[in-house]
């Protein structure tokens, strides 16, 4: 129990500074299977319907929408990448529920489970220019404070290396990769793991077999990054001190996600 308390306190201290005034940052949040309540014709999501084994009705759906929006608003960064949303209507519902005035980009991933990526952003801070879709990844090229910035959200993408080969051909391309990068040899493209400090300190964003793991990470070629870590608030955890999941062993718990968000931010309005 003492070890758990020390871990949680270290996370709280690490994330408190992310609320500083004029920093710019990007977060990534695996929302853990946020389906709507309507059966799909293209993949099997019957479990997440009112008649399915999870009893996924409009009340449970609306509750989770509000929870995800609360997390996004709490993070309060100009760009938040999401993974695990079923479709564009789900993204619209999240954005509508947010207090922050987010615009969004959504693309259908056409995966076996029907789960997509979305990028929420403040339109006065990040200016998207081009969207590139890859299996297991969403890449958005744009500008932030008159500097080129490319944001890649990924979840076990097998084509991430090919995408990076394309992106690295551009000069002065500032790139941030967030999510589950699998076994990517990121050093090949001169990237560093911005979340390495959190990993070495034993911090994680998911519990596997009773142990914290940093399932998602942040990779970047930007040298001026100020901090990258796991985002934590007490209400994101259950009474055991683990991520407050929507379902646990098939039982509805009404929580947020079995993952915690991760983030990277920069002081002085993008000093890169």
Tell me the role of every PLM-derived stretch.
Residues 53, 60-68, 102-106, 200-206, ...:
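N-terminal post-signal-peptidase region of extra-cytosolic proteins
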Residues 3-15:
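Sec-dependent N-terminal signal peptides
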Residues 85-148, 154:
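Structured beta-strand-rich core segments of catalytic domains in phosphoester-bond hydrolases
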Residues 23-36, 130, 148-157:
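Active-site-proximal beta-strand elements of phosphoester/diester hydrolases
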Residues 18-97, 109, 267-272:
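N-terminal, active-site-proximal structural segment of metallo-dependent hydrolase catalytic domains
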Residues 31-34, 86-89, 109-113, 125-127, ...:
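Solvent-exposed loop/turn segments at secondary-structure junctions
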Residues 26-31, 68-91, 120, 151-154, ...:
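Active-site beta-strand/loop signature of hydrolases that rely on acidic residues for catalysis
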Residues 19, 168-176, 182-272:
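Metal-dependent phosphoester-hydrolase catalytic domains
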């Amino acid at each position: 129990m003492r070890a758990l308390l020390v871990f949680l306190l270290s996370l709280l201290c690490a994330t408190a500074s992310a609320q500083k005034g004029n920093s710019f940052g990007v977060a990534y949040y695996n929302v853990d299977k946020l389906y709507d309540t309507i059966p799909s014709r293209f993949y099997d999501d019957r479990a997440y319907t009112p008649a399915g084994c999870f009893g996924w009705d409009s009340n449970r759906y609306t509750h989770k929408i509000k929870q995800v929006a609360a997390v996004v608003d709490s993070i309060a960064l100009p760009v938040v990448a999401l993974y695990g949303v079923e479709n564009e209507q789900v993204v619209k519902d999240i954005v509508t529920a947010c207090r922050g005035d987010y615009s969004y980009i959504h693309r259908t991933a056409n995966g076996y489970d029907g789960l997509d990526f979305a990028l929420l952003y403040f339109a006065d801070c990040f200016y998207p220019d081009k969207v590139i879709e890859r299996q297991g990844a969403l890449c958005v090229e744009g500008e932030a404070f008159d500097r080129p910035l490319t944001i890649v959200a990924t979840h076990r993408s097998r084509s991430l290396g090919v995408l990076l080969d394309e992106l690295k051909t551009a000069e002065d391309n500032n790139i941030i990769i967030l999510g589950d990068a699998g076994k990517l040899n990121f050093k090949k493209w001169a990237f560093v793991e911005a979340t390495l400090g959190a990993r070495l300190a034993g911090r994680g964003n998911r519990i596997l077999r009773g142990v914290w793991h940093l399932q998602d990470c942040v990779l970047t070629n930007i040298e001026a990054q100020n901090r990258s870590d796991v985002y934590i608030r007490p209400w994101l955890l259950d009474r055991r001190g683990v991520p407050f999941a929507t379902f646990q062993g098939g039982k509805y718990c009404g929580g947020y996600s079995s993952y915690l968000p991760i983030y990277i931010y920069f002081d002085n309005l993008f000093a890169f």
